[in-house]
Amino acid sequence: MKLAEVQDQMQKTVESTQRAFNTIRTGRANASLLDRIVVEYYGMETPLKSLATISTPDATTIAIQPFDRTSMGAIEKAISLSDVGLTPSNDGQTIRLNIPPLTSDRRKELVKLAAKLAEEGKVAIRNIRRDAIDAIRKREKGHEISEDESRDLQDQVQKSTDKFIAKIEDLLTTKEKDIMTV
């Protein structure tokens, strides 16, 4: 396993954590809140964003304009059943989601959720590190690389691990500030 591959895997983990953070509601309208919603459409699970145009006309509203008006009921149902905690209102052409201000208790819950997602990302990075170091030690035992090369590679993997974990911690700090800002 090459160092570049390890860093690439770690970067993908950071990006995945960032996407997970984007789905956490902060009190401001953000179309990415609906990224994980799938709609039962003609018997198939279809992502909401492929069935409608999603926009944020103001800081507290998300507007969803379905390409096919017959899908409005299914979209409303999917949003109601999802974990976003928003109630859709339908005017016949557009589905609107009003984002209520977050209570302090809800903000604390969201900070805990963000911390949990960050921890999952850090665990994934540590697992990548463990796999990489195991592969390096295996190559050393097989006499493919020297003990010094093995130690150098392990140090590089550890430095990469520290760097990517710090990135996740920075993302978490930013998200926590975002959530706690009224």
Swiss-Prot record:
Gene3D superfamilies: 3.30.1360.40, Ribosome-recycling factor. SUPFAM superfamilies: Ribosome recycling factor, RRF. One of its GO terms (cellular component) is cytoplasm. InterPro entries: Ribosome_recyc_fac (IPR002661), Ribosome_recyc_fac_dom (IPR023584), RRF_sf (IPR036191). CDD domains: RRF (cd00520). Its main location: cytoplasm. Keywords: Cytoplasm, Protein biosynthesis. The keyword Cytoplasm applies. NCBIfam families: frr. This is Ribosome-recycling factor. The gene is frr.
